[in-house]
Structures are given as structure tokens and as C-alpha cells.
């Protein structure tokens, strides 16, 4: 395994995760002022998309680490 390549990919994934987490925090702090949930569907979808991307990136890092350890 090329450890340099693995490290570079891990760093890239981590940068993406940090950006997604920052965006997620902004969305989670959005003031909805009692707006009904059915009107916030777009916000909820975006939050779920960011959560899925973060989770997917976590899985990628775990897989890379497992491959490196073999």
C-alpha cells in the first residue's frame, strides 16, 4: 500500500467532512419560528443529505484504515 496516497485521500475526505459539518451546524441553527414541519421539507432534506455524506465519508475513512492495516 502507498501510505502517502492513503494519507492524502484521508485528508481530502476529512476536509470534505469538516465543510459538511460546518454547513450542517448552520442549518441546525436555523430559526424556524414555529413554521409547520411540512413547510420545512427542503431544510430537512438538506440536513439529511449532509448527514448521509458525513456518514459515507466516515465509512470511507474506516475502510481505508482497514486496508492500510492489512
Residue ranges of each PLM-predicted region?
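Long, low-complexity or tandemly repetitive, helically biased scaffold regions used
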Residues: 2-7
Amino acid at each position: 500500500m502507498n501510505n502517502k496516497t492513503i494519507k492524502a485521500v484521508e485528508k481530502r475526505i476529512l476536509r470534505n467532512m469538516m465543510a459538511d459539518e460546518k454547513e450542517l451546524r448552520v442549518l441546525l441553527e436555523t430559526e424556524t419560528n414555529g413554521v409547520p414541519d411540512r413547510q420545512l421539507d427542503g431544510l430537512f432534506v438538506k440536513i439529511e443529505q449532509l448527514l448521509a455524506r458525513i456518514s459515507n465519508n466516515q465509512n470511507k475513512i474506516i475502510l481505508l484504515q482497514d486496508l492500510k492495516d492489512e
